[in-house]
UniProtKB/Swiss-Prot annotation:
GO terms for biological process: iron-sulfur cluster assembly. The keyword Ribosomal protein does not apply. The keyword Chaperone applies. This is Chaperone protein HscA homolog. Chaperone involved in the maturation of iron-sulfur cluster-containing proteins. Has a low intrinsic ATPase activity which is markedly stimulated by HscB. Disulfide bonds: none annotated. The gene is hscA. It holds the Pfam family HSP70. Signal peptide: none annotated. Keywords: ATP-binding, Chaperone, Nucleotide-binding. PANTHER family: HEAT SHOCK PROTEIN 70KDA. It comes from the Bacteria. The lineage of its organism: Bacteria, Pseudomonadati, Pseudomonadota, Gammaproteobacteria, Alteromonadales. One of its GO terms (molecular function) is ATP binding.
Length: 620
């Protein structure tokens, strides 16, 4: 769906002018830029005819180097040569240091706990490093296409959370380029294959790149790409295959404590061996150690497959969960699209074929397919294809909701809801005269706030001081096409409102998302029981609060004996509500209700009598 091009009256909007826009695959290991030229989408090479740009940035006192120029020094200067920066985007320093082994970089923590890399060229963060990768890609595109870009579509893993997506946008802003849209990588691949092959039905997109794995189940129908379910792991990819080989090298060569340069040498050789074993059944690994000694080791494909087997099976488990979430079986999947350089590994293709029951699609270069899809989408968004009816419907990975009394979660937007989306729900006050309400936005599938992830907190002030339950506050959740969330609370009678845009200070890994989903399924029955208990406890508290207010105001309507009966039942309810028996609480509420029916009738009569006092029949 094209963005409207509006001109002032009397001026041409140049409807036939081709507008320049590109798609960028900002990858963990390599990045690419693609454009639609003469109706065909393809990646753009540099002056050396290289299509991919290594996602490597080196900082020195004399300047910043990107791509192959930086990669060439990764072994000699690993401390200042930053690789796979995408894995650090939106994550805390604590998370990185606990999850990543043998990192050669010098880190500092920012005020909010995010990583800062200390380099000879100054201190930089993952957003700034990512912008350095984007700069040569944008320059390449403008040089090749012969003009200034009107915008770019940048791809991100489907499981990138709000912080990671916002970081990607910020990186583009530092580059000085307009982001038309962030596009999920599997969705980009579906665009490329959908337009080329005209497929309709259920499609699985298996995306195994250098540092991330995503599985998406999509329904393609008459130009509509709808993501039914997503899954994956933001810390699993070809880099992990390399790490398994690297660990094997260290063990075989009896490398105990090793230098950063030796680690980097083994990493580089591990990647070369992995790529060689894609075509050959055996290859020779060779590394020169710090003493100048040549170390060699014969590595077979069988050995390599044994090392990575558990990792590959882990991706298949994610595929199984995604199919279950989508409500489809592998038999219903028409095609499986392979994306990412790591899908060239024969074991990966074989395991996917075994699980899906059919040979996966590899007709478009798996390294380029994401960039190609992004280019097609960029071409549409700038208005070069106004006749296109291509529609993208992505989904959110975890439910979004609000904390209510008793620590309960009221889900406002359910998991796997297509985005962009807006959902609204009404809430009310708990106490008489309440003039403010605190909102706690949470993410997750569990029934209690304690078991979900906190996203943000904000307060709505200026609520009219009415009786409990009389004020009406409308809470609206909006998730835009890039997966960013804004929450607005508005008191309906006055129009007073407060809002917040949720940009978490750091991200949530896909492993954690997977664990949250597993926990929600494993604890479903217990969670419902706990929710029912909490709901009854909240109801008991509301009844007691209301009754206390009534007694403070109208106790004179009751005799001492009547007051004693009510207070005895109130004390009983308070005691039972502090225990863990929902049925007993409900029974105690009913007993108290019965005991206060006469009191309620007397209050009603008294209110009517006061309202009619001094009124004649004619005035009524």
């Amino acid at each position: 769906m094209a963005l409207l091009q509006i001109a002032e009256p009397g001026q041409s909007a140049a409807p036939h002018q081709h507008r320049l826009a590109v798609g960028i695959d900002l990858g963990t290991t390599n990045s690419l830029v693609a454009a639609v030229r003469s109706g065909v989408a393809n990646t753009l090479p540099d002056e050396d005819s290289q299509h991919s740009l290594p996602s490597v940035v080196r900082y020195t006192q004399s300047g910043v180097f990107v791509g192959r120029e930086a990669e060439a020094f990764s072994a000699q200067d690993p401390q200042n040569t930053i690789v796979s920066v995408k894995r650090f985007m939106g994550r805390s320093l604590e998370d990185i240091q606990s999850g990543e082994q043998s990192l050669p970089y010098v880190f500092e923590a920012s005020e909010n706990g995010l990583p800062i890399f200390v380099t000879p060229n100054g201190k930089v963060n993952p957003v700034q490093i990512s912008s350095e990768i984007l700069k040569p890609l944008v320059a390449r595109a403008e040089s090749t296409l012969g003009g200034t870009l009107e915008g770019v579509v940048i791809t991100v893993p489907a499981y990138f959370d709000d912080a990671q997506r916002q970081g990607t946008k910020d990186a583009a802003s530092l580059t000085g380029v307009k982001v038309l849209r962030l596009l999920n990588e599997p969705t980009a691949a579906a665009i490329a294959y959908g337009l080329d092959s005209g497929q309709e039905g259920i499609i699985a997109v298996y995306d195994l790149g250098g540092g991330t794995f995503d599985i998406s189940i999509l329904r393609l129908n008459k130009g509509v790409f709808e993501v039914l379910a997503t899954g994956g792991d933001s810390a699993l990819g070809g880099d992990d295959f390399d790490h398994m080989l690297q660990a094997h090298f260290a063990e075989q060569w009896q490398q105990g404590a090793v230098s950063a340069s030796m680690i980097r040498k083994m990493q580089i050789e591990a990647r070369r061996v992995k790529e060689a074993l894609t075509e050959s059944s055996e290859t020779l690994a060779t590394v020169i150690d710090d003493n100048g000694t040549e170390l060699t080791l014969t590595v077979s494909r069988v050995l390599f497959e044994g090392l990575i087997s558990k990792l590959v099976k882990k991706t298949i488990s994610s595929c199984r969960r995604a199919l279950r979430d989508a409500g489809v079986s592998s038999d219903e999947v028409l095609e499986t699209v392979m994306v990412g350089g790591s899908t060239r590994v024969p074991l990966v293709r074989q395991e996917v074929e075994n699980f899906m029951g059919k040979v996966p699609l590899t007709s478009i270069d798996p390294d380029r397919v994401v960039a190609i899809g992004a280019a097609i989408q960029a071409d549409i968004l700038v208005g070069n294809k106004p006749e296109s009816d291509l529609l993208l419907l992505d989904v959110i990975p975890l439910s979004l909701g609000i904390e209510t009394m008793g620590g309960l979660v009221e889900k406002v937007v359910s998991r796997n809801t297509t985005i962009p989306v807006a959902r609204a729900q009404e809430f009310t006050t708990f106490k008489d005269g309440q003039t403010a309400m605190a909102f706690h936005v949470v993410q997750g599938e569990r029934e209690l706030v304690a078991d979900c992830r906190s996203l943000a907190r904000f307060t709505l002030q200026g609520i009219p001081p009415l009786a409990a339950g009389a004020a009406h506050i409308r809470v609206t959740f909006q998730v835009d096409a890039d997966g960013l969330l804004s929450v607005t609370a508005m008191e309906k009678s006055t129009g007073v409102q407060s809002s917040i845009q949720v940009k978490p200070s750091f991200g949530l890994s896909d492993a954690e998302i997977g664990n949250m989903l597993k926990d929600s399924m494993a604890n479903a029955k217990e969670d419902i029981t706990r929710r029912m208990l909490a709901e009854k406890q909240v109801e008991a508290a509301r009844v007691l609060e209301s009754l206390n207010a009534a007694l403070n105001k109208d106790a004179d309507l009751l005799s001492e004996d009547e007051q004693s009966v009510i207070q005895t039942n109130m004390a009983s309810l308070a005691q039972i509500a502090s225990e863990d028996d929902a049925d007993a609480i409900e029974a105690a509420i009913e007993v108290l209700d019965t005991a206060t029916q006469d009191f309620a009738a007397k209050r009603m009569d008294n209110s009517i009598r006061l309202a009619l006092k001094g009124q004649s029949v004619d005035n009524i």
